[in-house]
Amino acid sequence: MKYWVRMNKEELQIALLLMKETELTGVLKVDPDFEPEKSKIDEMIRKKFLKQEDSKVSWNPFVKMIVWSVTHAQSVLKINIPNKALRHIYFYDEIMILLSKDHEEDIYTFYFVPVLPEAIGGLANTLEELKEIIPEKGKAEAKKIPILSEKEKELELTEIISEINDIDVVAEHFEPIVVNSDIFGKHDVQNVVVKMQEIFWWVERKDENVFFYPVEFYELMEFTAKKIVRMHGASIAFKRKGMNV
């Protein structure tokens, strides 16, 4: 099966209207004067968004789930990275949808990522692979902070990060995000991802030192999405609960 839906601006407006929505937050507002031609809707019915069964027209359930999820997202992460197509990440229930937009044309692509517990549960143990996406420049810029106190030696990595006082070495503010042992289940996780001063860092504990490696956020999200899909595939794609569409 496909894990994405691609549409142009007009198709997206029609899809929103069919869902009785007039806005995709931060991305597109349907023009109040927009009245799609019947031929355009028929084209969508025939080719892309709707399917014909027993002489009845109904939504393609995958497309409906995508549009429903982005218009009813419980949280939205906005991305503003120059020269990158990724614009928004939507979270609804147990799924994540990445939205990219072509720079030259009004082409929107929604990538579906199942973030069910069984999908993300095993991902924490594969974070070592993040080293593969850290460029040599990032490895050279790694920050090393020694664990000095006996108290810190007994703490979990996320607790150690909270105890770090040498803020000049790393940053003035940080917060756990995307990948940590709380989100990814109960695992013996020795690395996390944190955000500090608008930079994302992969944090690793080695013996009595903590290392911070800068990670490019777009590549981080792409890695995470591909890993989930590759690990679990179509078998979990439609295990939906609590979504009345």
Positions of PLM-derived features:
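Short, amphipathic alpha-helical interface elements at domain boundaries
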Residues: 1-45, 49-66
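Non-catalytic recognition/regulatory regions in large multidomain proteins
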Residues: 51, 57-245
